[in-house]
């Protein structure tokens, strides 16, 4: 849930599905996970120059300015992976250098709004601190080996709860790969949002429930934790 995908500085609707999902996470899911000792892994785009150089054409097109209008995208926002995003409104009355699109350490790749504070609090926990994992595709579990897969194996984690944006792209891609690799998958439906039409969200929730694992919601997860503790 990075600035590029949620910040009004990139034309995002501050009342959209992604922001509603963020509210559910902050209010219900994250506190419940911490109470239950569930490890929170913040999986985010964080590209290196080498990764941009080796990126397949299909991925370059997804975030590129060339042909953006044909897919309903703003060419001034979708400047190409690694492309400079320029000065942006920081949401605090000032401006900030947006940095290279989805590059590691860039402002546009940082967590949006209150989530940054939530992450900083979580990574300082003495037990099961939050973890930040970089990815370089929509799915964080694509191919033979990724940073996320290595972490999950090292920690012996086999059951995964999925949240974030966009449900039908990054979240869904990772969930499907996780399912194929033998993980138990639970989609927290209202903890995930997408800028795609509503049917895209419905499709992901339908298949997550019928084929890829389970679907729950953030409030239900929190209530379940409360009953267990």
Residue ranges of model-derived segments:
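A cross-domain feature marking catalytic cores of carbohydrate-active enzymes
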Residues: 1, 44-45, 135, 189
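Short acidic, Gly/Ser-rich segments with clustered Asp/Glu that frequently serve as metal-coordination loops
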Residues: 2-8
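Active-site loop signature of alpha/beta-hydrolase-fold enzymes
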Residues: 4, 48, 194
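A short alpha/beta connector and helix-capping loop motif
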Residues: 9-33, 37-42
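Active-site-adjacent betaalpha module
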Residues: 28-31, 35-36, 61, 65-229
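A general structural signal for short secondary-structure boundary/capping elements
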Residues: 42-45, 210
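Short catalytic/ligand-binding loop motif for oxyanion handling, primarily in non-cytosolic enzymes
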Residues: 49-53
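Short, flexible, mixed-charge acidic loops at enzyme active sites
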Residues: 55-60
